[in-house]
Structure formats: C-alpha cells, structure tokens
C-alpha cells in the first residue's frame, strides 16, 4: 500500500501550509511550442509500421493503467493531465520531441525524452519505469514525434508561465468552497475520482514528487483546463486556492525525493525538503 505523506518545507512560501504533492506530468519547465494549435491529426497517420506505432503509442498514453498495469501505481493515465490526447495547449505534447535532450534542474542532468517519460511514470503515475529501449517506450516516443511533425528543433527556453503565480497567497478554506462547487461533481467529494475523472488526492492519485504537486503548476493547469465542462471560467485566485486545497491532502510519498534539485534552488512551491535545501 502506498505511503501517504503530507511533506512540508518549514519556512518556505506562505501558501505551503500543509501542501503535499499533473506527470502529470506537467510542462512547467518547458517553453510553449508555437505549433500547439496545429497538432498533426488522425487523417495523416500513415499506413504501415510507423502508423501502427503511432496508434499504439497513443493507446498506451490514453489507457495507461489498463495497457501497462505493471508500471502504473494509481488510477491516473497520461492523458489525465495531457488532455485531448496531448493536443491541448496547456500540457501539450506537440513539439516535445523536438525539445529533448534538455537539461532539467530537478534531476540536475541532461535528460533524454525516454528519461522524462519514465520520470512521469515514477511520479505522476506513482509507478515504475519502462524499459527505455523497449517497444512500449518506442511507440510512446513515436507518438510524440508524430504530434511534433513540422516543429523545428531548438533549445528549450526557461518557462515564464508560472511566474505570475508568485504574487498569490492561497486560502485553502476558499479553495475548499471552489472544490465543492466546481470540482467535486467529477473528482468526488473526497478527491477519490469517478469513472470519468481521476482522483486528485489519496492513495490512488499522483505522488508528492509529481509536477502537479506543486501549487503553481496545478494552478496553471486548473486555470486553463478546469472545470472540464467550462474551462477557463475560474478566476486566477480561485484556481490558486483550489490547487492549494487539493495539494494540502495526503498522497503517496516518493522514495528519493530528497535528491531532487541536486544543485540547489528548488522552486518555492516544492513541498518537501531536499538535500541542498533542507
């Protein structure tokens, strides 16, 4: 059974009163690709082995738990955060193939795209890594390449998307009200999820090391994509408050999380201590 955790870094940013953990595998660390609105469509998936790999990769990403049960430790799938099969602008996979390898501060190394995928399996899926040279990883990366058709290779610029959230202070009581009014109908009153929406806290959700466990990352995702039936209707403060409320609940721990950001300077909304920032 997963260990539930409510890690807190003492003395950090006021919003992190008891924040625990979209993986999600979110894209907080990546620049927005210019081609996000023009993802390649089904009509141009070719016949033959390449097209078969594209379709299988998409199937693995949209039915991750059913397709790869040995590697998924919760009730999420990759497209729980990367909506519209990875085509939605906030969380898009369009262009991601062209941005790797890239240096990422969380690991402190230059990551390949296979490493990044496996990081999501460990964190957002609370599971285990795929064989980086195996057929499952090959087909997932092939789908990314297909979506990135026509996107030029360029260095990944540091993202500025999360900077605006630095000015916000969370009110988790207000977040609870937003959750009850706008989120519980899909995600459950206790965050347990429903048949059509993933759990957002508890043993079956993403773990404390997932990108979505960061309040700023979650607020950015929520502000663009939620509620699912009326995206973009929440005010920024409401998105921030509900992100803090969701992440104030227990969720699975991540072994080795203290080794994140090995060169220091973790983002201020990381809810757990690291070896370089206790």
Where do the PLM segments sit?
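Gly/Gly-Pro-rich "capping" loops immediately C-terminal to redox-active cysteine motifs
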Residues: 42-43, 69-118, 192-227
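N-terminal secretory signal peptides that target proteins for export/translocation
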Residues: 1-9
